[in-house]
Amino acid sequence: MFINIEPLYSSMVENIKERVSKLSKPPKLVAVTCQPDSSTLAYLRSQEKQAKRFGIDFAVYEAPKAMDLKILLPKLSADGSVNGIFLTHPLPSDISEYEAVSLISPDKDIEGRHPINLGNILYDKPVFPPCTAEAVLRIINYLTNPSGKKIAVIGRSVTVGKPLAMLLLQKGIDATVTICHSRTKDIAEITKNSDIVVVAIGKAKMFGKDYFKPGTIVIDVGINVEGDEIVGDVDPSVSEICELTPVPGGVGRITTLVLMEHTVKAAEMSLK
């Protein structure tokens, strides 16, 4: 069956609204875009809509060149009126993601991509984990107690696979985690021996029913374009034997709320 995340989604919405109402002024979220394509512009419109829904001020700044980023990001980080900053892709070719995200103050890095924020996860002290990784953790905690569960994470990206594995290993969560990737042999053997499988590999419908035992919780992080459709990394037929998050309408919806939550948290932290 497809997993119904609506109760989790609704509770997060109410939590954000309540926290914003207690602030003396609206939080401010800033997006920095470099060379936006049509999908980036659509993403920005979506984030602006969500921000306005919660009473969060939203602004977009353009930095077409690497030098523009090197000037703008430290300036925004030092601006007391700005609470959260996120950076869109694609980046200019002459600056790496590591270098770019390192220009954002860690306490305004609401996407959780700064090396300090990623490092905090290793010490079981996450402040702003990467939004998608946190969204997956929220969904897992909503569905079950992960303590002692065998969880396979398919994908090793710096924003999903790696940080999610570390979050699942935290004391108090205590999952047993296996990370798989493109060079992993016999992935099906691992996934069939897992209680929960998180798929974040970026290949449309790559994982079918032959990868899972009945009753497995399957979290599909993938977002792929196939013709006129948005599809995940997992074939929808898997829902016939497993609990599967839908694509679209699953992890992505929670990820957006985590971004807004982080913005509110940054505003709350700035008042302390």
Curated annotation (Swiss-Prot):
Chaperone in keyword set: no
Keyword Oxidoreductase: yes
Gene Ontology molecular function: methenyltetrahydrofolate cyclohydrolase activity; methylenetetrahydrofolate dehydrogenase (NADP+) activity
Keywords: Amino-acid biosynthesis, Histidine biosynthesis, Hydrolase, Methionine biosynthesis, Multifunctional enzyme, NADP, One-carbon metabolism, Oxidoreductase, Purine biosynthesis
Enzyme Commission numbers on file: 1.5.1.5, 3.5.4.9
An annotated GO cellular component: cytosol
InterPro entries attached to this UniProt entry: Aminoacid_DH-like_N_sf, NAD(P)-bd_dom_sf, THF_DH/CycHdrlase, THF_DH/CycHdrlase_cat_dom, THF_DH/CycHdrlase_NAD-bd_dom
UniProt record, GO biological process: L-histidine biosynthetic process; methionine biosynthetic process; purine nucleotide biosynthetic process; tetrahydrofolate interconversion
Pathway(s) this gene product operates in, as recorded in its UniProt entry: One-carbon metabolism; tetrahydrofolate interconversion
Binding site for NADP(+): 155-157, 182, 223
UniProt record similarity statement: Belongs to the tetrahydrofolate dehydrogenase/cyclohydrolase family.
Subunit annotation: Homodimer.
Listed PANTHER family: C-1-TETRAHYDROFOLATE SYNTHASE, CYTOPLASMIC (PTHR48099:SF5), C-1-TETRAHYDROFOLATE SYNTHASE, CYTOPLASMIC-RELATED (PTHR48099)
Record-given protein name: Bifunctional protein FolD
Organism: Fervidobacterium nodosum (strain ATCC 35602 / DSM 5306 / Rt17-B1)
Gene responsible for this protein: folD
